[in-house]
């Protein structure tokens, strides 16, 4: 049986971070297992040095998946995550795309992007 995944994208704006300015604030993406998904984060931040990606699943604390080091064009994965599962693509200035590969049911949740100085 093929499972479909629902990925909710929410972009919050706490005082200590900058976040996406997507109209409506939340988008939904559904993809079959073993496929890929792309999540776009558009930030109008002139001095963005690090773009952080988080996953929040029901009943669990948010988990940082990775951060993208803008100056070095490099993803830094959190320990324990599979290399090649997540990576960031930057198609244009102030836009970052998180790509999730080989989706499984456990990838369902709410994904956040944020920028911090470090």
UniProtKB/Swiss-Prot annotation:
Species the sequence originates in: Homo sapiens
Protein name in UniProt: T cell receptor gamma variable 5
Self-association state and partner proteins as the record states: Gamma-delta TR is a heterodimer composed of a gamma and delta chain; disulfide-linked. The gamma-delta TR is associated with the transmembrane signaling CD3 coreceptor proteins following the stoichiometry: a single gamma-delta TR heterodimer associates with one CD3D-CD3E heterodimer, one CD3G-CD3E heterodimer and one CD247 homodimer forming a stable octameric structure. Upon activation, gamma-delta TR complex associates with FCER1G to initiate intracellular signaling.
Listed GO biological process terms: adaptive immune response; innate immune response
InterPro entries, sorted: Ig-like_dom, Ig-like_dom_sf, Ig-like_fold, Ig_V-set, TRG_var/const_region
Role: V region of the variable domain of T cell receptor (TR) gamma chain that participates in the antigen recognition. Gamma-delta TRs recognize a variety of self and foreign non-peptide antigens frequently expressed at the epithelial boundaries between the host and external environment, including endogenous lipids presented by MH-like protein CD1D and phosphoantigens presented by butyrophilin-like molecule BTN3A1. Upon antigen recognition induces rapid, innate-like immune responses involved in pathogen clearance and tissue repair.
Localization, UniProt: Cell membrane
Keyword list, A-Z: Adaptive immunity, Cell membrane, Disulfide bond, Glycoprotein, Immunity, Immunoglobulin domain, Innate immunity, Membrane, Receptor, Signal, T cell receptor
Gene coding for it: TRGV5
Entries under Gene3D superfamilies matching the protein: Immunoglobulins
Cellular-component GO terms for this entry: external side of plasma membrane; T cell receptor complex
Keyword Membrane (UniProt): yes
Signal peptide (from-to): 1-17
């Amino acid at each position: 049986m093929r499972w479909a995944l629902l990925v909710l994208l929410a972009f919050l704006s706490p005082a200590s971070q900058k976040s996406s300015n997507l109209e409506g604030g939340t988008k939904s993406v559904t993809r079959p297992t073993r496929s890929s998904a792309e999540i776009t984060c558009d930030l109008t931040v002139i001095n963005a040095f690090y773009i952080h990606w988080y996953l929040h699943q029901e009943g669990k604390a948010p988990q940082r998946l990775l951060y993208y080091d803008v100056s070095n064009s490099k993803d830094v994965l959190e320990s324990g995550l599979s290399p090649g599962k997540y990576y960031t693509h930057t198609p244009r200035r102030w836009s970052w795309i998180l790509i999730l590969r080989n989706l499984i049911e456990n990838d369902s949740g709410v994904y956040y992007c944020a920028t911090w100085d470090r």
